[in-house]
Structure formats: C-alpha cells, structure tokens
C-alpha cells in the first residue's frame, strides 16, 4: 500500500489519504507508511476519545454512519481446487466469466463488468473481475496468488429506513448477501 501511495503521489502530485487491502491492511495518511494497523489504530483511538468526550461510544458513531451512508454486508468465499486440474478449473472459470458475464445475479442486473486484466485507473493489470450490480451490490472474483483457490468477494449495501432497528437492516442485508452468494456459486459449480 505504501509503495503504491508514494508512486501515486509522485505521478499525480496528489496527497495520500487512506489505503486498504483485502487482507485487512490499512494505511492512513502519509506520516506512517504502515499497512498493518499502527496509523489506523491511532486514528481509531482519536475517534474513540472524540466520541467519549461527547458521552458516546464508537459503536454509537458507527450506527450513525450506517444510518447516513447505508449498512454494508460482506463475505469472502474461497473455492479450493488443488492440483494442476484445479488450477485449470480456476483459469477456466475466469475465462468463462470474462467471455460471458452473467446479465443478473439473484434478480439484480449486472450493470458494469470491470476487467482489471488490462489495468485501470493507472493500476497495473491484475487477474480480477468486478461485477457491479444494481443497488450498489458487487461480486469480485480473483485467483489467489499463493494457493490453488478462486477467491470471491460479495458486497451488499442496505439503506436503513428511518426508525428501523439496525438488527433488522442487518438481517435484510444478510439475506440479500446469501442470495447473491448462492446465485454466483451456482454459476461456478
């Protein structure tokens, strides 16, 4: 993350704000070029102190964020396919989804397919497919770089209705996520 931030700042005369990787690495700001949580922990401690001074908890703050921007429900599912046959199956799945992406998943139209194999936004090419569905849902597919696995990431954004308990919104999100995951997994079978 830090190297990409430095390269971006040099190439675009921009300012690095935050970076994130799927393996839960965060880097916040340019002062500490660390992706393993040191700078993020400091920012989190500052957030906790700010909320405590107002008689609130970090969870209260998070609830406010959910109500303002929506509740995000995510899941990662890895399909392990050992051996050379397994690697061929993973390559075949990526090729098949590139050539004929689904028009819809779980009743939600696939609005955009982003194929990162060509590189995008100044990033180098990567064997990743991103399916952007109606309503802010996403499915991301990529082979593992170190194991015989096809990694699949599922994301659903749920609007929280005024006065709706967050537990109810979360349950709706989990149900939508399960339907999205199951529909995609059936296409991989």
Describe each model-derived feature in a short phrase.
Residues 145-147:
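A generic beta-sheet turn/junction motif
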Residues 1-142, 151-153, 160-189:
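Phosphate-binding and adjacent anionic-ligand microenvironments
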């Amino acid at each position: 993350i830090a190297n990409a931030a430095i390269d971006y700042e040099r190439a675009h005369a921009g300012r690095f704000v935050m970076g994130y990787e799927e393996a839960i690495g965060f880097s916040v700001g340019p002062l500490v070029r660390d992706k393993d949580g040191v700078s993020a922990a400091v920012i989190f401690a500052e957030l906790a102190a700010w909320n405590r001074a107002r008689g609130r908890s970090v969870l209260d703050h998070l609830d406010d964020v959910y109500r303002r921007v929506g509740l995000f429900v995510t899941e990662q599912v890895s399909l392990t396919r050992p051996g050379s046959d397994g690697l061929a199956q993973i390559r075949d799945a990526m090729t098949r989804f590139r050539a004929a992406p689904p028009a819809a998943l779980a009743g939600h139209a696939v609005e955009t397919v982003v194929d990162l194999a060509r590189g995008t936004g100044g990033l180098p090419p990567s064997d990743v497919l991103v399916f952007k569905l109606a309503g802010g849902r996403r499915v991301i597919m990529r082979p593992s770089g170190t194991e015989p696995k096809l990694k699949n990431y599922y994301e659903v954004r749920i609007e929280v209705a005024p006065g709706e308990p967050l537990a109810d919104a979360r349950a709706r999100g989990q149900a939508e996520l399960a339907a999205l995951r199951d529909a995609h997994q059936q296409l991989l079978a």
